[in-house]
Amino acid sequence: MGPDMTIFSSKRRDVLKLMAGTALLPLMVAAKPAMAQDVALRAIVISDLHSAYERIGQLLAAVETRIAADKAPHIILLNGDLFEIGNAVAARSASEIEWTFLAALAKLAPTVVNIGNHEPDIDNDLSNFVTRAQALGITVLSNIIDKRSGKPYAAASAQVSVGGRKVVVAGLATNAINTYPKATREMLDIPQPFEWAKANLPGIVKPDATNIVLSHAGVVADRDILPLLPDGTLLVGGHDHLNFVHEQGATRYVHTGSWCTSMTVATIAAPGKAAAIETVTIDRSAPASPALKTLIEQTLEKHLTAEEKAIVGKSAKAMTVDEAGRHVAQLIAAKTGADVGFVGHTSFGAGLPEGDIRRYDFNASLRFDGKLMVAEVDGEALAQILKRCNQDGDIPLAARTGDYLYAMPEKPEVKERYKLVCNDWSATNQKSYFGRSDLAFTEVPDVKLKQTVLGGLS
C-alpha cells in the first residue's frame, strides 16, 4: 500500500450536491411512476478494462445487446482502469478506441465512472480525463484531491435518476501511490480508503435510495468498509483483477473481472433489497460492436510496428490469465532450478491465444518485465506462503489478500529447505505478497522475466 495521505472530508460538498439533485426528484419520479415502482433496476458493472482491444468491441456488443433486449431501466458503472500505458497502440493513438467506447456507453444509459489508478496512464493530468468524460455526459466520481488546487478532481458521490429511481453512487480510489503513473503522483493527494469511508459514506448513502459504492481500493480496504454500509448496498470492487460475489445480509460485494473478459449485471428490485448478480463472460471470438469494429482494426493496422506483429512464440492451446500465470511460475522455477516459482497475479492482463503469439499479444498477457529474485525458506515457511497463493478459486473473503501470487508447483516434494524464485516486484513488496518481511532475496544475474518466458514459448 502507499503511504498514509491527508484525509479530505468531502461530506459538505456531497451533501450540497445531493440536496441540489433532490430538488428535481419529485418531477423525475412523477414522470414515470409505474416504472419506478414496478420495474427492477439493472446495473451493468465493468472494471479494469486496461485497453484490452482484443475484447473491448465484444464487451460493448454485450452491453448493447443486453440493454436493447430488456426494457428495465439501466445504469452503467465503470469502476476504474479503462486505460493501459503498457498497450503501445493505446499510447500512440491517444486511446481513441477507449474514448469511442465511453461515448457509446453514455448513449446507451446513464454512465458513471470511478477513477482508478490507470486513468492518468495516457494523459497524466487527471483533470483532462474528468473534463472530457463529463463532456460526453458521463458522471465522474473520485475522492482524489488535486494537490495543485487543493480541490477534488471530481465529486465523490452523485445522485442519478434511472427510470425514476433514485440511485446514490459513491466512488473512492486506492491510495497505493506507486501504482499510479510516476509523472502524476506529485499531483495526487489520496485519503486512506477506510478512514475516508468512515468519515464520508454515512453522509452520502440514503435510506430511500438504491445505494452503490464503487471502490477501486482493493479487497483488503473493502473488507473493512463493508460493515460501514447499510444493508442492501451494492459494493463494487476493483483494482485486484478478481471475479467473485460475496453476500453479507442483503449487501452484495462484487468483483467483475478484468481485461474485458466479463461483466456483471446486478438486478435491484427496490432500495435496500439484495441485488441478484449475474456474471456474463465475454467471448473473444464473438462479433464486435459496429461502433468499434472498424476503428479497432484500423487503429491496430496504423499503430502496430513490425516488431510488435512479429511471432515470438506458440501456445498449444488458448490460456486464461490464471493458466498463463501458473505456466509462467513453472517456467521461471525450471529456468532457475527453484523448487517453487511465484509471480504476481496483476502482472498479467490477458491470457494467451492458441497458436502463434505476436509480441503485442505477449506484452498484453505479461504486462511487466523485471529481474528474477531467489530466496531460501524452510518447509514451515513455505507452507504458510502457499496458503496465500493461487486465489483464483472459491476463496472466503476473510482469506483474500487482494493481489496474490501464482505458485507452481502447488505441492512440491517434501524436503527441509526450499529455493523460491519470483519477479522483482513481488520480492520488493514481499509483505503484501508473501505475508512476511524476513525473506532474504538475491538477484539472479543476467536473467529477466520476459526473456525466460519467451524461451519457454518458443
Residue ranges of predicted features:
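Acidic, metal/ion-coordinating pockets
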Residues: 16, 36-284, 323-326, 330-331
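Short, well-ordered coil loops that connect the C-terminus of an alpha-helix to the N-terminus
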Residues: 21, 72, 231-232, 337-338, ...
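Short, motif-level signal for alpha-helix interfacial/capping segments enriched in acidic residues
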Residues: 25-28, 217-219, 223, 356-357
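Catalytic centers of hydrolytic enzymes
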Residues: 39-40, 46, 51, 258-335, ...
